[in-house]
Amino acid sequence: MNKYRLSDETRLWHWQNGETKSVTPLRQIIATTDFNDVLCGTKGGWVEDERALAQDGQCWIYDENSVVFAGATISGNARLTLPCMVSHHAHISGNCWLDGAEVSHGARISDNVTIQNSSVRGDCHIYGNARVLHNSMIIAAKGLTPDQEQILKIYDNATVSQSRVVHQAQIYGEAIVNYAFIEHRAEVFDKAILEGNDLNNVWVCDCAKVYGNARLIAGFDEDAIPTVRYSSQVAENAVVEGNCVIKHHVLIGGQAWLRGGPIMIDDKVVIQGRARISGNVLIEHQVEITDDAVIEAFDGESIHLRGEKVVNGESRITRTPLLGAL
């Protein structure tokens, strides 16, 4: 037994893909039986044809300003509330909830996912109990990295809010991403927290990874943007705060704490233990900082450490060492 019929009335939906303008006739869904919280006779959104909304399951398009077209499908128990646009072979299934969302161009949304006031575009899969909230933009694109087949994924219990996630990035576990920009093949997972604000985002790019209980926290001053790039990793209980740029093959772990600025760490540097780094500091070329070591540049001064050396124990450095002093 069908749960809805299509209206005799049609509505022309004008849309544009690149420079190509198109018009698609849509028809409104009208419930023909009571199911879930939908009463017989209730009018819903507009679809291109019956393939857009499954006749079985509890799925429904609640808002009369929602549209589903261009090969997109809604199935299972999925719900669309507030005006939503689902198009271009996007597939919404399971117990998903779309609320004021736009999903298109091959995106797959399944399981118990929530997409609220956000857009998802491109060949990606968002599943599990993941949430994408508060004007986030998910823009998937394959082929921009050496891995031609990897697709963007957000899954498990990950939450993305006020953020942009693009290319082939991966966010999963219990990760919380707020006011951040994640691109290329970057990964954020476990219980990592990225906490930007309305002035400064957190950036994780290239093949960088943030995981464990690590935290990246943006400040409110100009350029107080924590940035992790290339193949660098921030892990365990490390905290990176403010104007910090982490570049090539850097590992920050333990309970290390970095507060810029600005701080730049580059080229196979390892920072772990309970190390503390703050102020205007440049560390590069295979330096290891561990234990309770402190690198602290006072206001108006800067520190530059480079070359193969280990700073450990309770060492405290407040100025650039003389050549050969370490």
Which stretches of residues belong to each language-model region?
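Terminal amphipathic alpha-helical/low-complexity segments used for targeting or macromolecular assembly
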Residues: M1-Q58, E64, N77, H89, ...
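A detector of tandem-repeat and repeat-rich interaction/domain scaffolds
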Residues: G71-R79, P83-C84, H89
